[in-house]
Structure formats: structure tokens, C-alpha cells
């Protein structure tokens, strides 16, 4: 049975984005459309949504029918969106990182081991598939990827078992990969399946998720209006670390001219952000109870104090 598509930390996202009538907003990760629809319903504003997954186009078209000129959709990865946005600027930008509930629920996409399906994991349907990767990657590189992107302490044991198995048969399904991972470390009863971290690591690597986040952040100031807000929901410690570092490095800091100066502190003009969330916000216990996918979510927000 498919889980309903529940937007993660929806109320917190709206509170930090603070949509206003007549303003324009960018939803960088359309997915099932939960954020876009909520922003459109909150006030008489405009939303442009992005997604590289062609499977979401029909859902975007339905929202377009309901909101007409207030909604626009572009099929693109957010890291590659700047040219397609044609120098358009926004009063708020939101990113909901990671895999969407819709992608997890469609068995043929190969993101989840809850169904035995083809081992794919590509968000755009293009490039190297998880099956191609898992059957060709060297053992050491595989172990490093599982450790780095999955925080998996048994990464070397898992990589060794995968390489041993593929000498006898090709690994071509999510069920088979999950079985190999479980057998390599033992199936421990608990809330989280032993294969979860390995699947997460392979997905992040296949879709180049961390580098794409860094590429987007490096250029985001060019499309955010003064006083515009940037709200990012992450699900992995490495994602959150990138966002936290970016906010810190680009946030305003009063700088005294000298310790003896009586002048008022000045602001470094290269620091163009003001952090809204002093620390990462987490979902409520009630939300996690209703939507287990929210359990690792963290939200950070900042506001542009200069316009580029």
C-alpha cells in the first residue's frame, strides 16, 4: 500500500518562507507538489516549480489548471535551472532535498527495498543506474561511498559481500541488494531496516545530490530579491552540514573597525544573508508519528539583506 504524499515540515516551511500577496516564489523540488500547492493557497502569490523527474509533469499540469497564471513548471534539475529561469528573481526559494515520497512509492523506480523491483534509483531516468554502478564499482570505492553517504559503520563488510555475490550472479533488483546487505551485517530487529543506509548512500551518489546542492547555493544569490527568504529542508547530515556552512559563511556579522574605534560596527558587504533559524528546526513528535519519513528532517532558513 502506498503512503499518502505528506509534505514534510509544511507548517514550519510556510512560517519561515512567509509568503505574501503579489510576490514570486521558487519551489526547487516540486515532487508531489505539496509545497507549491500550500504556498499558492496561503496567499495571492506566484510560484515557479522545478523538478528533473518527468513523472511529475502530469501532477504539475493539474496544479496549473487550478491556478493558471499563478503557477509555472519547468522540467529541470535545480542546479541547472539558472539559464532556464532567464534572469527571473524571487521573493522566496524553498528546497526539499532528497528523494520524494512519490519516487519511493513507485516500485519500478528502484529507490525502495519495500518492493522487489529493478535496481534503478535515477531521479531523471538518465545517466548511470544503480544496477550498472553496483555491478561494476570497485570494492574499496563502494565501501567509501556507503560509509560517506550512508554513515554506515559496516560499509567494508557490505561492500565485500556485494563484490563476492556479483561474481556468481548479477545484482539487478532492490530485493536482492537488500538481502545481500542484511546477510552481511545480520538482520537486526528494529525500526530501521539494515539496508536503509546503503540504499541512501547509493541514491545520493548516483544522483550527485550533494554536489548539485553546492552548485545551486553558489549561484542562488543571483535569483533572490532583497528581503527574499531561502528555506531548505534536508534529510542527511552531509546535506545539513553544507547548508549550515553556507549560511554561516554568507551571513551578516558586525565587524568593528578596530578595538579602539568608537565608530559603530559595520557590516561586511560580502555577507548577504541574515540567518532566521538560530539552529536547525526539527519536525514535531506528532508529525514523525504520522509520517515516519519526516524523522530525519532538518529545516534552516535565511533572508537576503543585499540584492545582487
UniProtKB/Swiss-Prot annotation:
Cross-referenced InterPro entries: RsmH, SAM-dep_MeTrfase_MraW_recog, SAM-dependent_MTases_sf
GO biological process: rRNA base methylation
Keywords tagged on the record: Cytoplasm, Methyltransferase, rRNA processing, S-adenosyl-L-methionine, Transferase
Localization per record: Cytoplasm
UniProt KW Thylakoid keyword: no
Broadest EC class assigned to this enzyme: transferase
GO molecular function: rRNA (cytosine-N4-)-methyltransferase activity
One Gene Ontology cellular component annotation held by this UniProt entry: cytoplasm
EC number: 2.1.1.199
The reaction(s) this protein catalyses: cytidine(1402) in 16S rRNA + S-adenosyl-L-methionine = N(4)-methylcytidine(1402) in 16S rRNA + S-adenosyl-L-homocysteine + H(+)
NCBIfam families noted in UniProt: 16S rRNA (cytosine(1402)-N(4))-methyltransferase RsmH (TIGR00006)
Function noted in UniProt: Specifically methylates the N4 position of cytidine in position 1402 (C1402) of 16S rRNA.
Family: Belongs to the methyltransferase superfamily. RsmH family.
Protein name: Ribosomal RNA small subunit methyltransferase H
